[in-house]
């Protein structure tokens, strides 16, 4: 395995940057974030270019993750929220490819690949977060399918037009709690489903939603995989998801550093540029070093994924490093740029609010460190 990028990755990076300059310029991204607008044309063009096709092949025999981290890092330079939407579609398409029937792929994957639909996931509940095995939303068998009742929270992108949720519900059965879960494919406009947008500090482009399910009648064909396979689907999904969102965070960190370096070189105080003061330059240099180290961690996890090797620990470490770094670098940038970085016609407010949630998505730091500790053989709590 090698963490050295190839000419193919460099060409892809150049292509993505040119694409984003046309379809997601900085001014437009700020407007989308401020107004909570979903850029439908952007994601239609992403679908047209075939970027989703990366996950519809045999991802154990190619450079699936290696290509995706390049895509996600470049998109992350524009917005980590755009990466979140990209990831939702990619992860959902991969789930459909690995677990879905031909009918499900035709019904749910084909519209996404055509840019006409979106995918989301619904796991968290008012009283259930990191402990996904404890979900209380229930799916009970009916004569011709399933009846679902429950509530989901913090579902990104679930209220977007044409969205389909991968809904995690309890189907019963014996054994451990995690063995009683299943995943259902549920269009958000299905009878009995109510979706409400939750006012949030960040992630305004994708939107964060709560979902109410009242006697939702689903056909048997809505079940993804088999009853009891929900935990396995989630576990597999989360590995590549962490790799993708980590690379997106690093793209955002790189953008924040670039903005702040430019500001420090241009802004003068007491007769000198801010970049002449070590109180400014040394913290920025440390962030740059941490960015390079975190990028190595992401690339290592991607290499292991593409080699078919276990990478749960590696992807968790990558997510821990990148999430912490995005939160801390955006806060540092706000401090250095002062009032200039606080006003809304600047990209920093978006990065700062999205950087805060970067610590939490795909597992908060405490849960990640607990998992890493147990992988070391320590008797960590849980």
Question: What residues fall within each predicted segment?
Answer:
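A short core secondary-structure module
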Residues: 149-194
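A short, Trp-centered hydrophobic/proline-enriched beta-strand micro-motif
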Residues: 115-123, 167-168
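Flexible, small-/acidic-enriched active-site or ligand-binding loops
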Residues: 134, 189-219
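A short, charged helix-loop
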Residues: 209-236
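N-terminal glycine-rich flavin-associated loop
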Residues: 83-103, 129-132
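Short Ser/Thr-interspersed hydrophobic loop/turn segments at strand-loop and sheet-helix junctions
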Residues: 50, 71-76, 186-191, 214-218
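Alpha-helical interface subdomain recognition
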Residues: 1-78, 99-104, 111, 115, ...
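A structural signal for short hydrophobic beta-strand segments in well-ordered beta-sheet cores
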Residues: 137-140
């Amino acid at each position: 395995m090698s963490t050295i990028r190839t000419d193919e990755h460099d060409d892809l990076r150049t292509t993505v940057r040119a694409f984003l300059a046309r379809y997601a310029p900085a001014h437009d991204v700020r407007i989308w974030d401020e107004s909570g607008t979903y850029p439908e044309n952007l994601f239609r063009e992403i679908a047209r270019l075939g970027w989703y096709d990366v996950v519809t092949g045999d991802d154990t025999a190619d450079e699936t993750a290696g290509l995706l981290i390049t895509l996600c890092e470049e998109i992350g330079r524009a917005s980590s929220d755009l990466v979140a939407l990209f990831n939702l579609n990619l992860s959902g398409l991969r789930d459909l490819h690995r677990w879905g029937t031909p009918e499900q792929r035709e019904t749910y994957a084909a519209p996404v690949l055509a840019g006409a639909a979106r995918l989301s996931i619904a796991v968290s509940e008012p009283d259930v977060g990191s402990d996904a095995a404890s979900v209380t939303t229930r799916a009970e068998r009916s004569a011709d399918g399933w009846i679902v009742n429950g509530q989901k929270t913090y579902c990104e992108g679930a209220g977007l037009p044409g969205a389909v949720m991968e809904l995690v519900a309890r189907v019963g059965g014996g054994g451990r709690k995690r063995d009683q879960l299943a995943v259902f494919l549920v269009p958000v406009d299905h009878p009995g489903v109510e979706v409400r947008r939750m006012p949030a500090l960040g992630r305004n482009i994708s939107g964060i939603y709560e979902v109410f399910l009242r006697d939702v009648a689903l056909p048997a064909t809505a079940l993804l995989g088999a009853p009891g396979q929900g935990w396995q689907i989630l576990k597999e999904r989360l590995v590549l998801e962490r790799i993708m969102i980590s690379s997106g965070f690093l793209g955002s960190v790189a953008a924040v550093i670039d903005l702040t370096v430019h500001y420090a070189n241009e802004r003068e105080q007491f007769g000198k540029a801010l970049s002449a003061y070590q109180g400014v330059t040394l913290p920025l240099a440390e962030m740059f070093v941490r960015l390079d180290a975190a990028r190595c961690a992401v690339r290592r996890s991607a290499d292991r994924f593409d080699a078919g090797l276990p990478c749960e620990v590696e992807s968790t470490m990558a997510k821990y490093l990148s999430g912490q770094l995005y939160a801390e670098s955006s806060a540092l940038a706000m401090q250095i740029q002062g009032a200039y970085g606080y006003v809304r016609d600047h990209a920093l407010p978006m990065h700062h609010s999205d950087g805060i949630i970067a610590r939490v998505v795909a597992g908060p730091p405490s849960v990640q460190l607990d998992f890493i500790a147990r992988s070391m053989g320590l008797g960590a709590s849980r």
